[in-house]
Amino acid sequence: MNAYNKADSFSLESDSIKDVIHDYICWLSMTDEMRPSIGNVFKAMETFKIDAVRYYDGNIYELAKDINAMSFDGFIRSLQTIASKKDKLTVYGTMGLLSIVVDINKGCDISNIKFAAGIIILMEYIFDDTDMSHLKVALYRRIQRRDDVDR
């Protein structure tokens, strides 16, 4: 998981958005005390949570509590729920929603690792290649914007 958590840059040509997301979800699944410090890549990933709050009509945290990938039935219900909200949330808000889901279920036992893995698998069903391309470009731009502000 240490590939991207401290990274400050992200390349559109050579870096994998899937790898970033997987590392980020694993990092989010840790308790606050256990999480290593982060660089600009994960700081930019955190901004997708803002999109989720901004684009969702209701309480995004209530919606996040209903997402469960720990059982087959929960996985299917979660997939249906997210798919029905994806147009309103946008791909960016959906990424933020899934980040919030992992963040509110964080911990340090094996069930948290399984939960994070379930969310990663859920993402594989939710995001197509076009969505991943949009997330990749958005992440790159958010990092660049952050670099411009920091200078």
Swiss-Prot record:
One Pfam match: Poxv_Bcl-2-like
An example Gene Ontology molecular-function term: protein sequestering activity
Keywords annotated in UniProt: Early protein, Host-virus interaction, Inhibition of host innate immune response by virus, Inhibition of host interferon signaling pathway by virus, Inhibition of host TBK1 by virus, Inhibition of host TLR pathway by virus, Interferon antiviral system evasion, Viral immunoevasion
GO biological process: symbiont-mediated suppression of host cytoplasmic pattern recognition receptor signaling pathway via inhibition of TBK1 activity; symbiont-mediated suppression of host toll-like receptor signaling pathway; symbiont-mediated suppression of host type I interferon-mediated signaling pathway
Cellular compartments per GO CC: host cell cytoplasm; host cell nucleus; nucleus
Keyword Kinase: no
Induction comment from the UniProt entry of this chain: Expressed in the early phase of the viral replicative cycle.
Function: Prevents establishment of cellular antiviral state by blocking virus-induced phosphorylation and activation of interferon regulatory factors 3/IRF3 and 7/IRF7, transcription factors critical for the induction of interferons alpha and beta. This blockage is produced through the inhibition of host TBK1, by binding host TBK1 adapter proteins TBKBP1 and AZI2, thereby producing a strong inhibition of the phosphorylation and activation of IRF3 and IRF7. Also acts as an inhibitor of the cellular response to type I IFN by interacting with host STAT2.
UniProt family annotation: Belongs to the orthopoxvirus OPG029 family.
Subunit comment: Interacts with host TANK, TBKBP1 and AZI2; these interactions prevent interferon production. Interacts with host STAT2.
Name the UniProt record assigns to this protein: IFN signaling evasion protein OPG029
Organism in which the protein naturally occurs: Vaccinia virus (strain Western Reserve)
